[in-house]
Design a protein with these regions (language model features):
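N-terminal alpha-helical "arm" segments
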Residues: 1-27
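Sequence/fold signature of self-assembling virion shell proteins
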Residues: 2-10, 143-182, 188-193, 199-301
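Assembly/oligomerization interface modules of large self-assembling protein complexes
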Residues: 25-83
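Short, charged/polar micro-motifs that form catalytic or ligand-binding hotspots
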Residues: 43, 73, 77, 92-107, ...
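Glycine-rich, often proline-containing surface loops adjacent to acidic residues and nearby aromatics
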Residues: 81-96, 151-153, 188-191
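Short, well-structured alpha-helical interface segments that form or flank functional binding sites
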Residues: 82, 97, 101, 105, ...
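An acidic- and aromatic-residue-enriched active-site/binding cleft used to recognize and process polar
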Residues: 90-94, 115, 122, 126-130, ...
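Alpha-helical scaffold segments that mediate packing/assembly in large oligomeric complexes
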Residues: 97-105, 112-175
Length: 301
């Protein structure tokens, strides 16, 4: 259905002082604070988690050396989606509008819609991260207290869900440092950045920026700050839906990823019979994760 003069009645008459509702600032590219972006040239991308060897053992004199097997643990797949939106304007609506170039106005609105869809899809990886209906390559949700590995269960979620505070933050950092690889070997892993909804920005500011402990009369230092435990600080994501869930991105490679299959593009064409002009925006991409060790989370208490 095309935008016609009947939908733009006031714009056909003189005396209108202002048009408003499409000039708001928008939140752009917040996904880049969470996901590592790579390009893709195929319908989907797959990444395989490798399982190496267990810890080496003592070889007694004269006894054969132990052999171990390496294998593939699981495969993470990113299937690209096509995101698109279009609108049409009648020839008469373009001709009779008295105030601005109507096509320019709505192509900007189209760009806002495309950007909003991308940010929602990106944030949904975290929004659905505690939901067992949305699983990754290992068959479990992104955040779990029992990711199954050859060397035993490993967690990237607090054992007891907790709101963001000094105690829960320190426990999360301890748990991150205690993670192991698929064979149970210790790995060097650290938190790099906290990701929070807008509701937690004041709590995060106090926890991350004050030099002394928050909410206590003790003259103790703020250990997380003085030790530089989260060097990139915190970022607010306005598309997170759980007001008390919080997350810590780690320095594990191949964690959360965004594959760009086709950058956003726009097309315009006229219809000879009706005179309508059609505008379309289109983009292809995917969001997901390969190694769940790339992020740690708590759904809040």
């Amino acid at each position: 259905m095309a935008i016609s003069r009947s939908q733009l009645v006031k714009e056909l008459e003189p005396g209108l002082n202002a048009l408003f509702g499409l000039e708001y600032d928008r939140y752009d590219n917040q996904h880049t604070e969470i996901f590592d972006t790579e390009n893709s040239d195929r319908a989907f991308e797959e990444e395989v988690m490798l399982s190496g060897f267990g810890s080496a053992s003592v070889k007694p004199e004269g006894v054969s050396v132990d052999f171990d097997d390496a294998t593939e643990a699981f495969t993470a797949r990113y299937t690209h989606e096509t995101i698109a939106l279009a609108f049409a304007i009648t020839e008469e609506a373009v001709e009779d509008n008295l105030y601005d170039k109507i096509s320019s106005r709505y192509t900007k609105a189209l760009a806002r819609s495309m950007m909003n869809a991308k940010q929602v899809k990106a944030a949904n990886v975290l929004n659905r991260g505690f939901n067992s209906s949305y699983t990754g390559g290992d068959g479990l949700e992104l955040f779990s207290t029992a990711h199954v590995t050859t060397g035993g269960n490993v967690k990237n979620e607090l054992t007891t869900a907790a709101d963001l505070n000094e105690t829960s933050l320190e426990q999360a950092l301890i748990d991150i440092a205690g993670m192991t690889d698929d064979r149970g070997l210790k790995i060097s892993l650290n938190g790099t950045k906290m990701i929070i909804p807008v509701n937690l920005q004041f709590t995060a500011e106090r926890l991350m920026k004050t030099s002394q402990r928050v909410g206590t009369a003790d003259n103790d230092i703020n250990a997380a700050k003085s030790m530089g435990m989260i060097p990139q600080g915190y970022v607010v994501n306005n598309f997170l839906t759980d007001t008390d869930a919080w997350f810590i991105k780690t320095d594990a490679p191949n964690g959360l990823k965004h594959f760009q299959r086709t950058p956003v593009s726009t097309k315009m064409e006229g219809d000879f019979e009706t005179g309508n002009v059609k505008y379309k925006a289109r983009e292809r991409y995917s969001f997901g994760w390969s190694d769940w060790r790339g992020i740690f989370g708590s759904p809040g208490a």
